[in-house]
Amino acid sequence: MQVSVENTSALERRMTIAVPAERVENEVNKRLQQTAKRAKIAGFRPGKVPMNVIRQRFEADARQEAFGDLVQASFYEAIVEQKLNPAGAPAVEPKSFEKGKDLEFVAIFEVFPEFTVSGLESINVERLSAEVADADLDNMLEVLRKQNTRFEAVERAAQNDDQVNIDFVGKVDGEVFAGGSAKGTQLVLGSGRMIPGFEDGLVGAKAGEERVVNVTFPEDYQNLDLAGKAAEFTITVNSVSAPVLPELNEEFFAQFGIKESTLEGFRAEVRKNMERELRQAIKTKVKNQVMDGLLAANPIEVPKALLENEVNRLRVQAVQQFGGNIKPEQLPVELFEEQAKRRVVLGLIVAEVVKQFELKPDDAKVREMIEEMASAYQEPEQVIAWYYKNDQQLNEVRSVVLEEQVVDTVLQKATVTDKSVSYEDAVKPAEAPAAAE
């Protein structure tokens, strides 16, 4: 078999392959012999049909089948021989497939980039440290109480944070407009759910009162027909309800699946969850900085096939997440290109770090991570057992642990600055990660 390779770009290869005619004819004859054993042709007993008849009837199909199989087999043999690592399926261009001649075809494909990860010493990482103070815990308890607020009807005038039940009719230029009317709407004043001025116009209103509120739709309002226009809403207040925060008692604790009957026990459980969240937030911020540093220090070209695959995967993911009657291919590629490129480049760089430093998932760290996740459940031992019985889930944890080991490897060579911050600053969402160039 003859093979020649042309580098048409940094990652694209144009490979010409010639398969000897003898091998081609052997493959064709092999298929014809198999066909002869099972062919049913009038006037002949099964398995007794003369080969010239078989060849006349089935040679074209046998040759086409042999072509497909030989292209696949010889392409694989060629990339092994040439030590190439394709990043996707090849585009095949037949050149010659005449009877008695060599089979010639061209395979065009991309290869994975070959590179060595470098510049780890140039990466700067700010590693945060924080503690869950009593004040942080108190704030969290108030947040939990507010999330479980109930409303009780009152006979006073409405004020911010009250919930009102309203009917309303909106008009623009004296005409009722689509989507501008509703009945029985529950609205918490001050929530910012309605357009500016609407909720303010109900402060001071009582149950049974009708008010006319004049507002202007924002210039950037999603409905372009209404953007920037003045509107008049006639609003009837059906009821006014005041917020009532739940007591910190056993009934409240039970809503969170916590069996503790004392405030001290509940606070201890909440603190434990906050500390878990804190550890994860700090770890995530360190990881993002490491990944950004790896990207900046190792600019690499990415195979188009990998990018296309990742874009398509993100499209499918978006449709599954947001639903709607839309097909993944209808979503613009531009929406996902930047994210897809970052993920593909990081995937290649992380894989190379694993290879260069000969990293393998640490079983002790795998166990530690599973125990950490299981601690959030009431029956942690059952969760741990489930992970170790489920190969797919266990492998996912092993992948995460391996990625953490990559981060640890980089941190050993990077410049790391430790900084103490408040709990609030530590758990604050990080800025969007940098895009791959």
Swiss-Prot record:
It is found in: Cytoplasm. Involved in protein export. Acts as a chaperone by maintaining the newly synthesized protein in an open conformation. Functions as a peptidyl-prolyl cis-trans isomerase. Belongs to the FKBP-type PPIase family. Tig subfamily. InterPro entries: PPIase_dom_sf (IPR046357), PPIase_FKBP_dom (IPR001179), Trig_fac (IPR005215), Trigger_fac_C (IPR008880), Trigger_fac_C_sf (IPR037041), Trigger_fac_ribosome-bd_bac (IPR008881), Trigger_fac_ribosome-bd_sf (IPR036611), Trigger_fact/SurA_dom_sf (IPR027304). Coiled coil: none annotated. The keyword Transport does not apply. The keyword Cytoplasm applies. It comes from the Bacteria. Its EC number is 5.2.1.8. PANTHER family: TRIGGER FACTOR CHAPERONE AND PEPTIDYL-PROLYL CIS/TRANS ISOMERASE, TRIGGER FACTOR-LIKE PROTEIN TIG, CHLOROPLASTIC. GO terms for biological process: 'de novo' cotranslational protein folding; cell division; chaperone-mediated protein folding; protein transport; protein unfolding. It catalyses: [protein]-peptidylproline (omega=180) = [protein]-peptidylproline (omega=0). Keywords: Cell cycle, Cell division, Chaperone, Cytoplasm, Isomerase, Rotamase. Gene3D superfamilies: 3.10.50.40, Trigger factor ribosome-binding domain, Trigger factor, C-terminal domain. One of its GO terms (cellular component) is cytoplasm. This is Trigger factor. HAMAP family: Trigger_factor_Tig. Transmembrane segments: none annotated. Consists of 3 domains; the N-terminus binds the ribosome, the middle domain has PPIase activity, while the C-terminus has intrinsic chaperone activity on its own. It is an enzyme of class 5 (isomerase).
